[in-house]
């Protein structure tokens, strides 16, 4: 029996690459859509086709229409927030020729917009960092009177303009004066912004629960893990992570997600305060895999395969329980960069770094069967570094990213 193809949208990302490899490993034909054909992840050999086209706007629909005309019914796997938004907006017209599992539009709005999410979590009694939603310059005075620096500033929703200007997902500001200096630029880049207190603790205090709720909105898979390091440090994506059991993370995730009618894939990140030990909800990711999706698969939990079968109306795999074997996952080059940064800050020794690599069994980019992405990764990074724009106002005051 011929299997329906899986279309990985935003293959040119570490998340997209891992998703394509995982699905291909189950014998599923994979088609990738990339914004950047020269990206190192676009060099993978695990796709039958790789098509160039926008994944961030409705131009994606033209590429999907071309695929459907040639390949018939396909299952869709968006691997970025922007592609989740495009599919959600056009879900009714797409359902004729594609199969996918996404939360309802109002649930996506609730979780993808951080202002909506933080208000929702706070109103239901969950702990979040002290948070402000400044819209006017006068609001800075209120922040100064109620919150001590450093301040974490982030957009309500990720925008291309924010990344172009600041070259990072969030800003860490050391004084109210710094916040005042970048305030207008932040509003211009994002529209709506969030200012939060920084929860004490290093990268290893960042925990998450990755979950899948089936098309009937029933809890089906949960998987808890934690970051050990991330790149960029303190505000980036995981580059070294490990499977771990954490009852509190699991409990709070189930309580929060259970309060809405949820279906599909998602994750919820927490930070455990280094002083009090209290868990704070940091952010959700919904409708798509996260960077460490390869860790879930290597630990024996077939979450993407379950999503594929669910989307196509097939029976779901039965063996989906987390085994808590302590598997570690690494993005090698990113972890080397992270380790160097921590070494320079005198927060990590070479010996400590080498010891932290024990137990690594899953790799984000490296693969003997699919070697080109790893080979081309450093060249892509060098190209991007040499082609970086002038730093934004925050970077001029902090020495760049």
Regions found by a protein language model. Give the residues of each.
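Flexible, glycine/charged-enriched surface loops at secondary-structure junctions
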Residues: 194, 263-267, 317-323
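Peripheral (often C-terminal) accessory segments that flank ATP-dependent C-N-forming ligase machineries
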Residues: 309-401
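Gly/Ser/Thr-rich active-site loops/lids in small-molecule metabolic enzymes
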Residues: 176, 290-309
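Phosphate-binding site of ATP-dependent enzymes
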Residues: 173-232, 243-254, 271-275, 279-280
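Conserved metal-phosphate-binding beta-hairpin within the catalytic cores
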Residues: 258-293
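Glycine-rich phosphate/pyrophosphate-binding beta-alpha loops
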Residues: 228-232, 236-240, 285-299
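Active-site nucleotide/adenylate-binding loops and adjacent lid/helix of ATP-dependent enzymes
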Residues: 108-194, 215-216
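ATP-binding N-terminal substructure of ATP-dependent carboxylate-amine bond-forming enzymes
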Residues: 1-103, 138-142, 359-360, 366-399
């Amino acid at each position: 029996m011929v299997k329906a193809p899986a279309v990985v949208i935003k293959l040119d990302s570490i998340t997209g690459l891992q998703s394509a490899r995982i699905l291909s490993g189950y014998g599923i034909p994979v088609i990738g859509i990339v914004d950047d054909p020269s990206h190192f992840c676009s060099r993978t050999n695990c796709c039958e086709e790789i098509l160039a086209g926008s994944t961030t706007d409705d131009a994606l629909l033209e590429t999907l229409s071309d695929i459907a005309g040639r390949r018939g019914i396909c299952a869709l796997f968006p691997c970025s927030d922007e592609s989740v938004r495009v599919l959600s907006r056009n879900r009714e017209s797409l359902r004729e020729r594609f199969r996918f599992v996404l939360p309802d539009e109002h649930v996506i709005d609730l979780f993808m917009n951080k202002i909506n999410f933080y208000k929702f979590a706070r109103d239901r009694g969950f702990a979040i960092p002290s948070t402000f939603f400044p819209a006017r310059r006068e609001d800075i005075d209120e922040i100064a009177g109620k919150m001590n620096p450093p301040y974490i500033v982030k957009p309500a929703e990720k925008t291309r303009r924010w990344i172009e200007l600041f070259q990072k997902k969030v800003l860490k500001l050391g004084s109210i004066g710094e916040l005042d200096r970048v305030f207008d630029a932040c509003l211009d880049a994002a529209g709506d912004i969030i200012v939060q207190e920084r929860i004490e603790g290093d990268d290893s205090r960042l925990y998450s629960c990755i979950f899948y709720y089936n098309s009937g909105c029933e809890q089906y898979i949960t998987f808890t893990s934690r970051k050990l390091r991330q790149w960029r440090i303190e505000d980036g994506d995981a580059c070294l992570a490990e499977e771990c059991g954490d009852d509190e993370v699991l409990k709070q995730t189930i309580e929060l997600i259970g309060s809405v009618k949820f279906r599909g894939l998602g994750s919820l990140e927490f930070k455990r305060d280094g002083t009090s030990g209290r868990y704070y909800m940091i952010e959700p990711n919904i409708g798509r895999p996260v960077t460490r999706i390869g860790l879930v698969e290597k630990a024996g939990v077939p979450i993407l395969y379950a999503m594929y079968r669910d989307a196509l109306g097939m029976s779901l795999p039965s063996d989906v329980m987390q085994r808590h074997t302590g598997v570690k996952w690494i993005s090698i080059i990113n972890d080397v960069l992270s380790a160097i940064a921590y070494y320079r800050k005198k927060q990590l020794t070479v010996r400590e770094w080498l010891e932290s690599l024990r137990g690594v069994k899953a790799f984000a980019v490296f693969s003997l069967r699919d070697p080109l992405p790893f080979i081309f990764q450093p060249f892509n990074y060098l190209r991007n570094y040499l082609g970086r724009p002038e730093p934004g106002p925050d970077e001029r005051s902090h020495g760049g990213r």
